[in-house]
Regions:
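Juxtamembrane loop-to-helix connectors within ABC transporter transmembrane domains
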Residues: 96-132
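Interfacial segments of multi-pass membrane proteins
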Residues: 109-118, 246-262
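Predominantly cytoplasmic-facing regulatory/coupling regions of multi-pass membrane proteins
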Residues: 1-87, 135, 142-233, 258-306
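Histidine kinase transmitter module recognition
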Residues: 28, 98-99, 113, 180, ...
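Gly/Ser/Thr-rich beta-alpha loop segments that engage phosphate groups in nucleotides
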Residues: 103-104, 242-244, 283
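Transmembrane alpha-helix interface/packing and boundary motifs in multi-pass membrane proteins
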Residues: 89-98, 226-241, 245
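Helix-loop junctions and terminal segments of transmembrane helices
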Residues: 67-70, 104-108, 246
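Transmembrane helix-loop junction
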Residues: 71-72, 94, 111-112, 210-211, ...
Length: 306
């Protein structure tokens, strides 16, 4: 029993956190349901298409970021394949978060195409770190705007477990970037694509909030969403479900001063666009899932793996 608990503790805690966050979200939706529906009607149809365009650009920018890292690491992959793998990873992250992560799908897909496992794995780790760096650049804006309402002790305590071994974390980071530290230009270009993705995301939020009659600074939106993103990295929920929406609604209500209905409406719309924009990945996913299943069969085999 203790072995089973140790193996599944993180998943169970995340499931419990997700369930709790979703319950709180449902209660909020029930309480503000009519107000939220009225708020949704204020969104302009043309802006729904503009946001769809921005999300399309955002997804392509994310694919370009990883493609640059792969190419500079010596992986001769065509952009079309990088794009397909990226969409497969996004779909798996959004729709299969408890079973197969998006990074696993990307890695297995790249290996299935015949590319080097070590380089692909390192490029995925570097891709994640560059994405985190991008959000980390604008997160201080969110902290500055919300400084008065943040419970600093609680905030710090929440992040301490991840920072208990900073030396080990630094070594892993340097090891991950060892290939690309000799090619700083590739890292910079990847970061530029991260900023393109972020501008599209923040622009989408800005459009929705403006439609709802609230005029908020673009940089305030950038800071508050980046802070929301960092909060969702705390492993208390699967893929940030519920937590992302509640955190953004809380920050928008208490920092910007908009109604909870506006905050939850915008958060729900952004989540919906994240889900919808990953749907192209379902076209390529079955072959990758089959490859993953075969790998699990081989790994479970009693024969030694060389």
């Amino acid at each position: 029993m203790s072995c089973w608990w140790s193996r599944n503790r993180q998943l169970i805690l995340q499931l419990a956190g997700t369930l709790l966050a979703v319950i709180l979200l449902v209660l909020l939706l029930e309480e503000k349901g009519h107000e939220i529906l009225a708020t949704l009607r204020e969104i302009k149809v043309i802006d729904l298409f503009w946001v769809a365009l921005l999300f399309s650009i955002s997804r392509i920018a994310v694919a370009c970021r990883w493609h640059i890292l792969l190419h500079s690491g010596g992986v001769n992959i065509r952009f079309k394949k990088s794009l397909a793998l990226t969409f497969m990873g996004l779909f798996a992250t959004n729709f299969l978060p408890t079973t197969i992560g998006g990074d696993v799908v990307r890695l297995v897909g790249a290996m299935q195409m015949g590319f080097d496992r070590a380089i692909c794995l390192a490029s995925i780790a570097a891709d994640r770190l560059i994405g985190l760096l991008g959000m980390g650049i604008t997160a201080p804006l969110g902290i500055a705007y919300s400084w008065d309402i943040l419970q600093i002790n609680l905030f710090a305590t929440s992040f301490l477990p991840g920072l208990q071994k900073p030396v080990a974390f630094f070594r892993r980071t340097v090891s991950t970037f060892s290939i690309w530290l000799r090619k700083p230009g590739s890292l910079l270009i990847s970061l530029v694509f991260t900023w393109i993705h972020m501008l599209c995301l923040f622009g989408s939020i800005y459009i929705f909030i403006d439609d709802l009659g609230s005029h908020v600074s673009f940089w305030m939106i950038a800071g508050l969403w980046s802070l929301t993103y960092l909060i969702t990295l705390i492993p208390i929920s699967i893929n940030g479900y519920g937590v992302q929406e509640l955190a953004f609604t809380f920050l928008m209500s208490n920092v910007v001063g908009v109604t909870p209905a506006i905050g939850i409406t915008v958060a729900a719309l952004i989540r919906a666009y994240f889900l919808l924009s990953s749907l192209p990945g379902v076209i390529f996913l079955p072959s990758i899932l089959s490859a993953i299943a075969k790998q699990k069969t081989v790994i479970s085999s009693p024969e030694p793996l060389l």
